[in-house]
A protein has these predicted regions:
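A compositional/biophysical signature of low hydrophobicity enriched in polar/charged and small residues
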Residues: 1-92
Length: 92
């Protein structure tokens, strides 16, 4: 049973940041249209951004341009998923 949410593309962006810039990174990231949530983490990473869009190009722009332009990012790992609609078209 597929719903509208399963057709959306998502990305989880895990960040190591300079603590002095963390608050600014969170505030700016929340203004990006594809960013649905920003979470502070304990452990290997400092922040996780959850991105979502019907358009993979929008997610790509957010990661490749918007997030990369933020001051204070030390390291970034992106985990990008594809919606079920995209998976079905690949498998056909």
């Amino acid at each position: 049973m597929a719903d509208d949410e399963s057709s959306k593309n998502q990305a989880y962006v895990l960040l190591n940041v300079d603590y002095k810039h963390q608050k600014n990174i969170i505030n700016k990231a929340k203004s990006f249209p594809t960013v649905q949530n920003v979470k502070t983490m304990y452990g290997i990473y400092d922040l996780m951004m959850i991105l979502e869009s019907d358009d993979m190009g929008s997610i790509k722009k957010t990661i490749d341009v918007d997030i990369h332009e933020l001051d204070g990012i030390i390291n970034m790992t992106s985990l990008v998923t594809v919606g079920t609609k995209d998976v079905h078209s690949i498998l056909e």
